[in-house]
């Protein structure tokens, strides 16, 4: 395998993506088809997402729990519509050693049925509400389509939150608040802009009253769902008997929400920000934010350069900046430059003998390739400012790219043509399933998101009165 990225992002997007994942050492393929192994840098990015989200969730009173991976078939079938939606994707455990299990066990595709069977035991009174629990775990869903690391795998890391409320209004407020919290995380940490709104009835989560979603557009013109938040109403509390007694001791079925996002965000980050050299990482989630490269290694001069590099590393680490000095003497500085560029490290510091004399170092930023001078003394303040600039500029560039991939269509012909070109297509829709399915069948585009707001004019499919102006797109 050649060291660098050999595929072009614009010419062979799929091969480029795979090379970046493998060569930047984010993940590797497992021996079982459809599964991947997460390597330390890939897991570090996931940990950053998790830490950021945990802080926000804790501020809302959400606590973390753990659920087992095995779910009895009898439990899955309690909410039949929900189960039917996942049945084709379920992995089943039928034996324990040589013995056949009585009730087949599903490897968790999602945890609603398991969690709510327990919630019905835990909740008795209005004093037990609201109940807000989040679970960081894996989900397993057999992928029958072609698989791709982080985007389509049969096992994936995610978080799923499940809350219970005394009234519909509080539950719906929770749904909206979680989606906003997701948006803040994705835009603020991953520098990926999203469009929020609702899913259509056809595309909503199975068993939900409605689903809210955040969607983004990838550079290849295909949409990616970044996270969802569902209002479940009483669709699960009734079959699972999640009930509470109010202050007058009158019993009611509870109102529920569920919500989740997965490591698919890492795939989106790779696609949105990466270039032909490899990864481009937003500083907030980069496992390594600054790499320091000494230019000289030999003699007293080399020792002085290395000492300066290590001194800067210590200063940056003390300031809370993730930094490392590349001390690999067998590799040339040029090779190191390319290697760290491929791995997406946001800032590179170069220190050579001449820099020591000047009392400065060369700072290069990965996202734009710009170089500048930074003083050796007190470098942490300057580098912190650069990291903030990088984070802001990456989000700005991604927003401009997203804006350029949203198109308007005022006729069905314009819609079909725009879908072929890739990106989101904004068009009036009557809200009818028949019109939605016609677009899907003839263009391959789904309704990805229905933003808030009314609509004027006529449905571009049937000519009926428009109910909304959704964004259509082909997706992952």
UniProtKB/Swiss-Prot annotation:
PROSITE patterns reported in the protein's UniProt record: AA_TRNA_LIGASE_II (PS50862)
EC numbers on record: 6.1.1.15
Name of the featured protein: Proline--tRNA ligase
Family according to the record: Belongs to the class-II aminoacyl-tRNA synthetase family. ProS type 3 subfamily.
Disulfide bonds: none
Catalysed reaction, written as an equation: tRNA(Pro) + L-proline + ATP = L-prolyl-tRNA(Pro) + AMP + diphosphate
Quaternary assembly: Homodimer.
Role description: Catalyzes the attachment of proline to tRNA(Pro) in a two-step reaction: proline is first activated by ATP to form Pro-AMP and then transferred to the acceptor end of tRNA(Pro).
Localisation: Cytoplasm
Organism: Cenarchaeum symbiosum (strain A)
Gene Ontology process terms (BP): prolyl-tRNA aminoacylation
Domain of life: Archaea
